[in-house]
Each structure stands twice: as C-alpha cells, then as structure tokens.
C-alpha cells in the first residue's frame, strides 16, 4: 500500500487522444502482450461502472433554456435593422448576408454556452447532461440542437441558407424549418445517401488503381531519395510524422560523424537526435534523404525498404503484404466517415475567428488619427484600419489605460469618443490560417421592381467588351432603380397630363391615339426621331423619353433668299450602338425640307455629275451647245449602268410584301409615314409644305449614302468621263428594270427605290466624289396589278386625272398609258405631259431636258415654259419609223453649294482646330433615271445632307469620337465625345488688351495658335479627359440650371477655378463677357417660356445651347428672355445664382451680365437630380421614401421614387444607363471572397477532383514556369536523351509532391490523419505514365501510346536510342483502365470495349495482381500465396553493387542536379530532391 500511495494519481477526464497516448506509452514500455492485458482490465472496469448506475432518457429530460426567447427576439431585431439598412442602400447584399449569418451564429453559440451552465445549475444529474458532457455519448452540438436551436444550415453546395432554424428538436420544427433541415447538410435526408455512395465509389476506384501493388522484394536498389528538412517551414509535428517509419536513402553525418546509415529505418529515437541536431545548428544541418514509394524502381510492385515500416507494428513491412489495398482503404474510409459527420455552418462567416478588443473601463478613448484611415468593415459599418501597431489610451476618472492594437486591425470607435466598460473598441484580423480555403463566389442581385436604371458618374460608360452590356465599377457607388410605370403604346400616346403633374394611381393615364389617325409619326426601328407637331408643344417630353439612339441638334437656319423664315429642322445624329466614329464617317444628317417631293405621286429623278474640271469654270460659261450632247454617249453610259445595276445591286430586287415589312418594322406606317388621302399640287406657294417638320419622309435609318455613292466608291463613277450637262439616259431606260416587282398583290408594293441597305458604318472615299448641282423630278405613275385584274383602259391610250384603271384603282396623273404584261403581274405606267407628233421625229434627241425660256427647234411648241421640261422620244407600236415625242413637266431643284457649315452651326461648335473638321456632303437618294415609287402617299426626300467627321490627313494619331448617353432628370442627353488619343498639345497664354470691352479673365487663351478649351496653359495629353460634358435641364418654366460633368482636371466654369480672391472680381468692369465666364459653356440662348425641352450637342470643350424658336414675333421673345433666371451647378454640387437678369440679344448670341457683382454662391441642401435616401433628415420632417429630386419649387420639391442598391468596386453592372428593367432582371454581379469550409460538402469532392486529376485551382504559376524552364534548359545542358528523362522525371516529381500536399491539406483540415505513404502509393500510380510524343519516331512504341516511365527509360537504354515522351497525369478512373492487366480493367468498367481491344491487340495478362486472380479463381499472390509466385534468383544479392558500377558518373551529376531543391513551391510540406544516373 505504501508503494501505491507514492504513485502519482491523475484525477482528470481522459478522452480519445489521451487514450491513444496512454496506449502508445504502454506499448513502448511493456510491449504488445502486456498492454492488451491492461486494456482488458480497463474495459471490464468501464462496463462495471456503467452498469452500476442506471441511466434512462425521456423527453422530460430535455430542458429548454429559459433565455432562448429573448435571445432570438434580439437577433430578429438586429436582422430587421439590417434589412432596413439594405433598403436604404447603406449596405450591399453580400454584407447583409454576412452579417445576418453572424448574428444568428452568435445567437446560436451563446445559447450553446448558456445550455451548459443552465444544466449545471438547474439539474446537474440530468442524464442528457451526464451523457454528453462526460463525453460518453453525443456532443455539445447535438444536445444544443435538442434543447437550444438548430441554427443556420448550409445547402448541399456549402452555401449558407440565411434563414435560421429557430426551433429545437424538442419543440419541433415548422414545415419550412423541416424542409431546410432536410436540405441542409447536417445529416440531411436529401444528401447523406448520395454522399455515402460517393464515398464508397471513391474507395472502389482507389482500390482498383492500386490493387496489384504488393511488397515483393527487399530492395530495388534505388539511389534516389526525397529530401526532408525542417527549414522549409515544416512544423516539428509534421517533420516527425513524415520521418517515422521511413527508410534512409543516404548516410547522415553530423560534422564528420555518421549517425545513421543508408537503408536504416527511422524510429522515434533517431528522429529526436535529428531534431536536437537541427536545433543546435539550424543552418549547417543537411537535409535528410528518405526513400518513399515514389522512388521505388520496380514497375508493378514495391520493395520493403521504399515502403518502410508497417503501419500496424514497428518493424519493416513483411514481404507479400498487399499494401496497395491497404492504402486505398485508408484513404477511402475517412471519406465515408467525413460524409456523415456533422460539421458547422459551411464557413460563410469568419466571424468566429476575429478576436475582439474590449475597453477596460468607462472613459474617453484617444488615438493618433494620422495612423489610421477610414474603411468599411465586412458588414458595411464604418471603421478605421490601422497600418501599424497602435497605442490607444482610455482616460477614465482616475486611471489612464493603454491598450495596444496590432496592425491591420479595425478600430470601431472614433477618436475622443466616450466608451463604456467592456465595449468592443477594435477587432483584430485573424491571421489567415492555412486550413481555410478562400474561394471567389459570384452573387447576383436581382431587381425588386420595374424601373429605369440610373447610376452615378462612377460607372465607366464604355462597357467591358465592345458589344456587351457589362460594366465594371471603379469604386463603390449606388445604383438606382427609378420607379417607372410602363404605358406601352406603339406611338406616342396623347397624354392628358403635362410634364410633372402628379397622378393618382387610378387616374386616367392617357388616351391612346389609334395608329392610323394622326399625321405625326415617330419612326421606329431602333431609332427614335423627334418630331414637333403642334399638339406636342407642351408635353414633348413624351417623345423625349423615347429617343434611344439618336439626338437632335436644333439648327437656326436663316435663308435670306426666301422671303419667309423656314423654321428650324433638326439634324439627326446617328449614334452607332456603343459605337465610335471613325474618320470619314457620316455622323449626322438632316433632310433639307426644300428637297422634298410633294405628295402627288411617284416619278423619276434626273441629275448629272459635275466633273472636276467643270468646277473651275463659272456657271456663266455654260453654253447652249453643252446641252445637246450626242446620243451615243448616253447609250454607252446606259449600258455601263445597266450591267452595273444587274450585277451588283441584287439587293434592290428585294420584293417587299406587306407582311414581311410588318414583321421587320412594326407597321409600315411607322416607317413610311401614314396614309393621307389628299394630293397636294406642287406650286410655288406651297413653301410651308417644305418647311413643315411634320411631313418628313425617312427611309430606313441605317442606310447611309445612296447608290451613286456606293457605285463611285467601288467601281469608279460611271459618268466620270462624260462632260454631258443636262440630259438623261436613253429614252426607255425606266422600262428596262423589268423584274423588280414580283408581288401579285395590288397596291402593296413597298420597293426601296434606289437605296442600298448598308448596315455597317459607311465610309466613303474622297477620290470619286462628284457633285451634282441640279436635279429634276418628273412625275410618273406606276401601278403593279395582279395578273387577273381586268383593265378598264387600253395600252398607249391617253387618259385624264382620276380615270378608273381597274375595279378599285384610279389614276393619280393624266397622260399616256403604257401596259406591260409579265408572268406574274401587269405593269401599268402613266406618263404625264403632252404628246406631240413632229414631222422629223428621228432627229429629235431622246430624253433631254430643256431649260425654261428656250424652245426646242424640232418641236412645234413655241410657248414659253415656266419650268423645265423633259422631252422623251417613244416609238409607236414597234414600227421603226414612227416616233412621237412626249413633253413632260418637271420640277427642278437647285443644289445650293454656298451653304456650308458656317451657316448651319455657330462658329464655336466642334471647332477643335487641327484636329476635327466636319464636312458637309449632299446625297441624292435616288438613282439617276430610276423610278421613285410613291409609297402610301408620303412625300419622299430627295437629298439628304450628311455631316462627315473628317480629321486632318497629316495627323498620324488615331482620333475617335464616340457618343455617350447620360440621363438625368428624366431627360436623355447624348454627348459627342471626341477623344484625341495621345496628341499632346502645348498651350500658350496671351494677355489681351483691356480695351476690348472689359477685362478678360486670365485663363483666356490665344485662339489663333492653340486649342480653345483649357483653362490653364499647360501641356497635357487630351486622352485623360474622356468625360462628357452635359447639361441638366430643369423643366420649370422660369429658369433652367446647367450642370457640367467635366473631368476634374479639365476646365471647370472659368472663374470657379481661378478667382480665389473675391475682391479681385469687384474691381473689374461689370460687363464681363459671359462667354469667358462660362468657360466651356459657350454661347447661350435661353429657352422660350412655353416650349419646354431642348437638346444640345456637346463636344469636349464647347456647348451649343440653342432652341427651336417657334415664336414668330421677336418682341415677345425679347420680353421672355428678360425674365429668365440662371443658375449654374458645378461638379461639387454648389449652386451659383447670378443675381442679375441677363440681357440676351438673340441675333448676336452674346450675353452680358448687367449687375455689379458677378454671382453669389449658395450652398443648397438639395439640388435638382440629386438622389436622396429614405429617412435622411434634411428638413423638420423626415423624407419618407428614397428617390431622385425631380423638380424644385420655391416651397416644395417632388421626388421620383427610386430604390438604391449599393455596389462595391469590381462589381459588374448589367444593362445600359437609362435602360428599363423589369422585376427580377439581373442588376449587379458581386464577386466576393468567402472562406470555404473544407468539410465534406466541399472536401470530399475536392479530394476526388485531385485524384481524378481535374484541376480545382490553377497550379501555382511559378511552379509551371519553373518546370517549363527546366524542360528547356536541361536538354541543352545534357543533350537529348538525358534531357527528356530528367525533364519528364522532374515534372512527375513536382506534380507528385504538390498532389500529396493538397490531399493531406483537405484531410488534415478535417482532423483526419492519414499517413503520407498511403497517398504516395496512389499518386505514384496516377503519375507513373508518360505519353510517347511524335517528335522522334521510335520502333518500339507508337506515338500517343501511354507507357510507364520506368518502362520507357529501360526501353531507351536497351535500344540505345532516344525515345521522346512527355509526362501525363491520369485520373484514378483512367489509371484503372490503363493497367497491365486487361482482366482487372474489364472487371472495373467498359467491359466489352476493354475485352475487344485486348483481343485485337493480342494482349497477355500475366495475372500479377489480386483482382485478376480473384476473377479467375486462382490463388491471390499475397500473404501465404506469395511464396508460390516469387522464386528468389541468386543474382538479387549482387544487384546493388552492379548498379554502383554502372553509375560511375553519378557523383558529378548529382552536384548539378542539387540546384532544383529550390524548385519546389514553398507551400509544399515535403520537398523533394532526387538524383539519378
């Protein structure tokens, strides 16, 4: 007894690990037999103790924790607050998810802690408490689920379901909770069965790969090894684990003393000696080389020494042991366990790992604010991040506490703030532990309501890919979805409400006008054009919202020749979709109302080219002879033209039937105008017809240019050689285009006359540009009638106007009728004009035009003509001699050349000298002498004037102009943004004389020799300023505000930047030219009070502000202008009011201030277009809804409801600015990092992916690079045979080690210990194959064949020729199907295919593995059956020495190959270094 009393008595609980340690100590001390006896006694003791106390377990024993109710309530309150923050746009979706997970996780954890103390205090003998907390059965987490709350679940993908299960199993779950609980990954019903099957299948494949690996001999004689050294950042524990049970590949010396010999197995004693040696001399210690299954030289088995000790006892593994199957089972079995273990919440949060710093007492906190900078926490709350260790002092009443906060921590309080005791003041970032995988996850945010997307200026306007609609966010900003209620209507509906009226929900929204009744039409087909008919004057914003791809420049167009002022017409600017304008691109056009055909009907356009020589002549020299050029010239030209037309312009022959057109363009009226059943005559007094913008005829918007233009580009101008003046092609030319009309339907031909559709950007060459200075329109009618229709008139008869032609067709013109019958239809042409039968008809020139005031000698006419006439010679009924002449009235249109840009644009528009010019080009729409068909009684446009962007030829740099659309306050604004890439221009500054009307601000530049849009003289590259300048219009009738979005380093509004001294301004002459003050604004014309919308073309430097002036009398205008108030909003959102009226002289377009002081600055609380979040306290009452300020009045403002979404940097925005989105459309895609749980939801699939050699994440790129370098360098150094061998070996060695490490990482993170050598055996099989490459043809293997690396080496040595091959990584499935035994392959998968292939190849199975023998019923070659298979040959003993002799130069090579120790990436646990002969 005395002895026992002296023994140490351990009174503490013992758990599994303690038990393990105890047993291993016992084995070391007493050996196996005695230990088993001791353990038996322990078991008996345990049983005895367990049965003496009887434990029952009933449902009453599950006691719910009393504090659960208020804890859950508290968490719900926090979630509600979070939801509100999200709604206000204060946190974004990812932060919301993270925080909600953490709130519930914390609640759940707190409950778990409460549970323990609750049991201990209230019922210490509770059986549940006794069982679980003694560690006998169950664990705290399970009991927590029974009596606490189940908490958060992961879905099968390992993502969090952010709806927590609040009930526990004692209370029972609600239906939703039950489904989540099944779905969640904690022993989920859904998922366990599948996972178990997966784990089982993994085990089966692993065993299949390595079933034939048996320990067959003692030593394979290899002299390779893998180096292990604790210097490579290995923990001591890992180092010990790696070494114990291995065999040394080389002697180990400390100093000159050898402490361990080659082929000695390493026990715990030896390892301890290594460690002490390393500690004593950490730098001088050499790495230890050990043998592993990787280094074994045998092909299909393994030797004792390379395998090392058996896992079951501390001695070398026995011969005949089936180590392959043991390895497969050891790896697969934890997988099965892993699937079924409960694991925690899928690891979305890392909240558990962050340590909190709490305040030691109440007091005032102070720290150095220069050492921190503001940031957002993971939950979107403001915090400070400290770069370096920070000392924080807390001043309480009597004591000064100092708290040290480590670097990279977040400080959650402000400087000088009062903190309470135990308040969290900082959060320490947890050191990133290696066990946490980080993964990047995408999260999509979807719109919660219909609306219009709006983003701040922080979004790049150019999308990421040229034609995509994805944009990256450069910094954190809000996206707003402005609420929209859609009124879908094919045309602009006539609205009962004016702009900015408030509407009741059930108010009458708008009365739609039927499609065919109104004469105002919006052209559809992707471009909205703006037309201002009279009824829309007050609410033109209806139209404004619809314009998508085009904007209109209002032009002030005075035509002095005409008596009355033609009202302005808009230039339509084509905005290529996301496009950039290139040189010589048409970027705008307008249809001059003077060149418009009346509604009277179809006809022919005739014109001629002016050749270049003629341009130098004056018009006065045009003599009469030039009119009468010879007929054969026309003929040749016509032939040329016909061939041209037939061969090339097949497009023209498109038959457009009614239906196809409808499908393509909506309704045909939308494109061509609409039916109008009156004909207007063409008289001089119908000027208003031309000037009226409502009667526009547009052909399809995508077409640029005309046929003529194209033909000139591609084939040279057909009329290049001719000098002919007025005249046409040969007389019957319009009847030659026979088969253009195929449609049998009456009146439904919609033929695109003389237009080629050209979808791309039209560029034209300057080479062949000809000019036409006059063209003529000859009326002529064409009816295409179905074959069946009965005609009421005869061919060649003469009819009057409105004669009935068929049952329901009447003629629009009077004149000669020609009828042609075709296969499918009948063509009926009516030529207007008089018919004459002259005597000498053959002498008359066919098809010539006669100017007014002259008479044709051959014709009997002697009347004076007002207009030009067109004489055509026709044959009578095929007879050769008889001709008659038809004299047809024409309308002549002069092309006026004098009009250039100066009259169209104010001088300061688009004038960026030396860089950009805009040329004016007129296009004639119709082909010469082609019939223009009247379509649905519309008027057609003959000439379209195009503006062409043109850069100076000499400039080498590319310049690009693109159009940006920005929308604010419900107005679309498109800006022409001209980016001059890499053109650095220097600026000079010149002081002006003071005499020129007051002082000029300092920043005025000399416009003669520099570009005119910089406020400071400096050398600067223009490519920095790629921002648009815009205007923000207020539709309030009294004043409008202008907002300039300019690059911050570009010029702001002149004086904002330069005048830092307000006194300096007062000394100036009060008449300051407004042009200078406005800087980039340029001239301003104010909006007319009753007309509310205006459009501006804005360049990078100038803004043109012009209006449609619908006011006839200018006095009224003048009065209106005097009442205007102006205010400017600059980029910093300051509003500047000019406190004076501005006198505007609309003729001179220059503005002056008429007041003593230039401006006053008022800092407004709100401004137009500003976005306001809900509950912002601007006024006494809170704002009830988030939205955009829509209009500001004296005492109130209107908000358009909007919903903000916060988006972080790097998020991708889907959709375009101003796009209408519907509920559920994707708005933003976040990319965020979350720590990935390495548990089985992701762990097992990950292990499987590695074994199957599918890439899970890219290899460390430096590893790939190093291997490539090696593969390049080594052949150079060593010559080819060595090079390939070593290159392939290196690749294989590297990949093997990194694979082992990856697999170990997953298992260790789960707390599962698997010995490296099991994994090594499997990886060895997966990586031991090489593929023969085609470089060198060898006689042994065919290219592409998979062979073992060792076999390839041996074959190469035997044949003395180099075999070219590259290393390949097979998955376990493919490795199982690429073994030496076809029987084992066939019993695994694809039986028929494998057997058929084996039969064709005549494969032999040597029955070396276990499976083949099992299948065929033989004795398996392991254990006792092993002896029969192995006959020891006497040479085995001498093998080692022979190898020594062979490898004479091993030592020299070894030094050189030592270099690649560093080749292994630093994260690998084991580094390898092998050397080879």
Swiss-Prot record:
Enzyme class: transferase
Catalytic activity: RNA(n) + a ribonucleoside 5'-triphosphate = RNA(n+1) + diphosphate
CDD domains tied to this protein: RNAP_beta'_C
Subunit structure: In plastids the minimal PEP RNA polymerase catalytic core is composed of four subunits: alpha, beta, beta', and beta''. When a (nuclear-encoded) sigma factor is associated with the core the holoenzyme is formed, which can initiate transcription.
Spans annotated as Disordered: 617-754
Natural source organism: Hordeum vulgare (Barley)
Entries under HAMAP family matching the protein: RNApol_bact_RpoC2 (MF_01324)
Pfam family, one: RNA_pol_Rpb1_4
Coiled coil: none
Binding of Zn(2+), residues: 220, 296, 303, 306
Translocase in keyword set: no
Domain of life: Eukaryota
Annotated Basic and acidic residues bias: 629-638
Co-factor(s): Zn(2+)
Biased composition (Acidic residues): 652-662, 702-715, 729-747
The EC number(s) this enzyme carries: 2.7.7.6
Disulfide bonding pattern of the chain: none
GO BP annotation list: DNA-templated transcription
Annotated cofactor note: Binds 1 Zn(2+) ion per subunit.
Molecular function terms from GO: DNA binding; DNA-directed RNA polymerase activity; zinc ion binding
Keywords per UniProt: Chloroplast, DNA-directed RNA polymerase, Metal-binding, Nucleotidyltransferase, Plastid, Transcription, Transferase, Zinc
Function description: DNA-dependent RNA polymerase catalyzes the transcription of DNA into RNA using the four ribonucleoside triphosphates as substrates.
InterPro entries assigned: DNA-dir_RpoC2_beta_pp, RNA_pol_beta''_euk, RNA_pol_Rpb1_3_sf, RNA_pol_Rpb1_4, RNA_pol_Rpb1_5, Rpb1_funnel_sf
GO cellular component: chloroplast; DNA-directed RNA polymerase complex; mitochondrion
Protein name, UniProt field: DNA-directed RNA polymerase subunit beta''
Compartments it resides in: Plastid, Chloroplast
Family: Belongs to the RNA polymerase beta' chain family. RpoC2 subfamily.
């Amino acid at each position: 007894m005395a002895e026992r009393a002296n023994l140490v008595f351990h009174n503490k609980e013992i758990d599994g690990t303690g038990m393990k340690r105890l047993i291993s100590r016992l084995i070391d001390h007493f050996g196996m037999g005695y230990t088993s006896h001791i353990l038996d006694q322990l078991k008996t003791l345990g049983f005895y103790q367990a049965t003496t106390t009887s434990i029952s377990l009933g449902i009453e024993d599950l006691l719910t924790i009393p504090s659960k109710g208020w804890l859950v309530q508290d968490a719900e309150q926090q979630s509600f607050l979070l939801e509100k923050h999200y709604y206000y746009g204060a946190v974004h979706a990812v932060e919301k998810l993270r925080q909600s997970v953490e709130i519930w996780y914390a609640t759940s954890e707190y409950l778990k802690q409460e549970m323990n103390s609750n049991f201990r205090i209230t019922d210490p003998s509770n059986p549940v408490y006794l069982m679980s907390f003694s560690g006998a059965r169950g664990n705290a987490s399970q009991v927590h689920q029974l009596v606490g709350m189940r908490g958060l679940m992961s879905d099968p993908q390992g993502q969090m379901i952010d709806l927590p299960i609040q009930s526990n199993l004692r209370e029972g779950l609600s239906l939703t909770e039950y489904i989540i609980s099944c779905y969640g990954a904690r022993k989920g019903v859904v998922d366990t069965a599948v996972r178990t099957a997966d784990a089982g299948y993994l085990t089966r494949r692993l065993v299949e790969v390595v079933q034939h690996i048996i320990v067959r001999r003692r030593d394979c004689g290899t002299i390779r090894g893998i180096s292990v050294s604790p210097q490579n950042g290995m923990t001591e524990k890992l180092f010990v684990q790696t070494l114990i049970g291995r065999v040394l590949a080389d002697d180990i010396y400390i100093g000159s003393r050898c402490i361990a010999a080659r082929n000695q197995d390493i026990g715990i004693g030896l390892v301890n000696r290594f460690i002490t040696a390393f500690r004593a001399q950490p730098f001088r210690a050499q790495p230890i080389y050990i043998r592993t299954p990787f280094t074994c030289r045998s092909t299909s088995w393994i030797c004792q020494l390379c395998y090392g000790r058996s896992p079951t006892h501390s001695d070398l593994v026995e011969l005949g042991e089936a180590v392959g199957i043991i390895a497969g089972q050891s790896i697969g079995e934890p997988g099965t366990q892993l699937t079924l273990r409960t694991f925690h919440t899928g690891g979305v949060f890392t909240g558990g790992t962050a340590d909190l710093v709490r305040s030691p007492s109440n007091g005032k906190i102070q720290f150095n604010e220069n050492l921190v900078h503001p940031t957002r926490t993971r939950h979107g709350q403001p915090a400070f991040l400290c770069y370096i260790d920070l000392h924080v002092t807390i001043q309480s009443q009597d004591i000064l506490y100092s708290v040290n906060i480590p670097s990279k921590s977040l400080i959650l309080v402000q400087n000088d703030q009062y903190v309470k005791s135990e308040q969290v003041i900082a959060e320490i970032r947890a050191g990133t532990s290696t066990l946490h995988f980080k993964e990047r996850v995408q999260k999509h945010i979807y719109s919660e309501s219909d609306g219009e997307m709006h983003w701040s200026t922080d979004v790049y306007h150019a999308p990421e890919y040229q034609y995509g609609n994805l944009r990256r966010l450069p910094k954190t900003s809000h996206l707003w979805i402005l609420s929209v209620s859609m009124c879908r209507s094919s045309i602009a509906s006539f609205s009962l409400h004016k702009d900015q009226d408030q509407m009741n929900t059930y108010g009458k929204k708008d009365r739609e006008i039927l499609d065919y009744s109104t004469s105002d039409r919006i052209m559809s087909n992707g471009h909205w054009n703006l037309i201002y008919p009279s009824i829309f004057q007050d609410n033109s914003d209806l139209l404004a919202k619809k314009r998508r791809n085009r904007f209109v420049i209002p032009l002030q167009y005075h035509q002095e020749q005409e008596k009355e002022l033609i009202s302005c017409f808009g230039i339509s600017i084509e905005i290529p979709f996301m496009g950039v304008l290139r040189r010589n691109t048409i970027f705008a056009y307008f249809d001059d109302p003077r060149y418009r055909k009346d509604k009277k009907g179809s006809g022919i356009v005739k014109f001629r080219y002016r050749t270049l020589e003629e341009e130098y002549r004056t018009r006065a020299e045009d003599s009469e002879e030039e009119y009468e050029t010879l007929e054969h010239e026309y003929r040749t030209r016509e032939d040329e033209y016909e061939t041209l037309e037939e061969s090339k312009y097949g497009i023209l022959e498109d038959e457009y039937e009614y239906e196809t057109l409808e499908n393509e363009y909506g309704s045909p009226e939308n494109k061509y105008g609409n039916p109008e059943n009156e004909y207007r005559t063409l008289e001089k007094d119908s000027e208003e017809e031309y000037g009226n913008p409502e009667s526009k005829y547009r052909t399809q918007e995508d077409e640029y240019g005309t046929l003529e233009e194209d033909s000139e580009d591609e084939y040279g101008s057909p009329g290049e050689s001719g000098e002919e003046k007025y005249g046409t092609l040969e007389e019957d030319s319009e009847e030659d285009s026979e088969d253009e009309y195929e449609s049998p339907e009456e009146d439904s031909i919609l033929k695109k006359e003389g237009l080629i559709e050209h979808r791309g950007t039209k560029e034209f060459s300057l080479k062949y540009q000809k000019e036409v200075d006059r063209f003529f329109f000859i009326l002529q009618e064409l009816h295409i009638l179905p074959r069946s229709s009965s005609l009421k008139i005869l061919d060649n008869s003469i009819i009057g106007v409105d004669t009935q032609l068929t049952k329901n067709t009447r003629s629009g013109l009077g004149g000669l009728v020609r009828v042609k019958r075709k296969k499918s239809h009948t063509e009926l042409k009516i030529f207007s004009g008089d018919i004459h039968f002259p005597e000498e008809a053959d002498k008359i020139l066919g098809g010539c035009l006669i100017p007014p005031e002259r008479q044709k000698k051959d014709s009997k006419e002697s009347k004076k003509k007002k207009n030009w006439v067109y004489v055509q010679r026709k044959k009578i009924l095929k007879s050769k001699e008889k001709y008659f002449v038809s004299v047809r009235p024409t309308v002549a249109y002069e092309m006026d050349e004098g009009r250039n840009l100066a009259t169209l644009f104010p001088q300061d528009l688009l004038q960026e000298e030396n860089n950009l010019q805009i040329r004016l080009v007129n296009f004639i729409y119709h082909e010469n002498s082609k019939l223009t068909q009247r379509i649905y009684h519309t008027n057609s446009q003959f000439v379209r004037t195009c503006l062409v962007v043109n850069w100076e030829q000499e400039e080498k740099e590319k310049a690009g102009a693109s159009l940006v659309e920005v929308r604010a306050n419900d107005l679309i604004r498109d800006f022409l943004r001209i980016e001059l890439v890499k053109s650095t221009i220097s600026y000079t500054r010149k002081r002006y004389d003071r005499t020129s009307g007051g002082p000029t601000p300092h920043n005025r530049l000399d416009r003669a020799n520099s570009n005119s849009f910089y406020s400071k003289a400096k050398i600067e590259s223009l490519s920095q300023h790629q921002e648009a300048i815009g205007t923000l219009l207020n539709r309030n009738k009294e004043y409008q505000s202008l907002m300039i979005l300019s690059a911050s380093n570009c010029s702001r509004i002149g004086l904002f930047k330069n005048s830092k001294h307000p006194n300096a301004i007062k000394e100036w002459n009060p008449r300051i030219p407004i042009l200078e003050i406005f800087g980039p604004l340029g001239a301003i014309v104010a909006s007319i009070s009753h007309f509310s919308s205006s459009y501006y073309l804005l360049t990078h430097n100038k803004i043109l502000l012009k209006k449609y002036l619908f006011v006839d009398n200018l006095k009224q205008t003048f009065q209106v202008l005097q009442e205007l108030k102006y205010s400017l909003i600059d980029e910093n959102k300051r509003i500047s009011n000019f406190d004076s009226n501005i006198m505007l002289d609309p003729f001179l377009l220059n503005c002056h201030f008429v007041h003593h002081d230039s401006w006053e600055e008022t800092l407004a609380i709100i401004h137009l277009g500003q976005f306001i979040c809900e509950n912002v306290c601007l006024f006494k009452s809170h704002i009830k809804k988030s939205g955009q300020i829509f209009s500001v009045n004296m005492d109130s403002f209107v908000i358009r409801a909007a919903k903000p979404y916060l988006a972080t940097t790097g998020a991708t925005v889907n959709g375009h600015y101003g796009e209408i989105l519907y509920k559920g459309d994707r708005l933003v895609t976040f990319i965020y990092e979350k720590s990935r749980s390495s548990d089985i939801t992701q762990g097992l699939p990950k292990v499987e992916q590695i074994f199957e050699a599918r890439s899970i994440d890219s290899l460390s790129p430096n590893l790939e690079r190093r291997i490539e370098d090696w593969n390049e360098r080594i052949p150079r150094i060593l010559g080819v045979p060595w090079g390939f061998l070593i290159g392939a070996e290196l690749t294989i060695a590297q990949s093997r080690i990194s694979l082992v490490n990856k697999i170990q990482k997953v298992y260790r993170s789960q707390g599962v210990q698997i010995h490296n050598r099991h994994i090594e055996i499997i990886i060895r099989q997966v990586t031991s194959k090489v593929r023969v490459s085609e470089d060198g043809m060898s006689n042994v293997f065919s290219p592409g064949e998979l062979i073992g690396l060792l076999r390839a080496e041996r074959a190469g040595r035997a044949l003395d020729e180099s075999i070219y091959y590259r290393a390949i990584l097979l998955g376990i499935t493919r490795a199982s199907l690429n073994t030496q035994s076809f029987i084992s392959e066939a019993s695994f998968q694809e039986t028929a295919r494998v057997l058929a292939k084996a039969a064709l190849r005549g494969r032999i199975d040597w029955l070396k593995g276990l499976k083949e023998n099992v299948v065929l019923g033989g004795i398996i070659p392991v254990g006792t059956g092993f002896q029969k298979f192995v006959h020891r040959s006497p040479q085995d003993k001498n093998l080692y020495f022979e190898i020594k002799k062979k490898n004479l130069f091993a030592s020299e090579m070894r030094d050189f190959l030592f270099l690649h120790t560093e080749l292994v990436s630093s994260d690998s646990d084991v580094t390898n270094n092998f050397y080879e002969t």
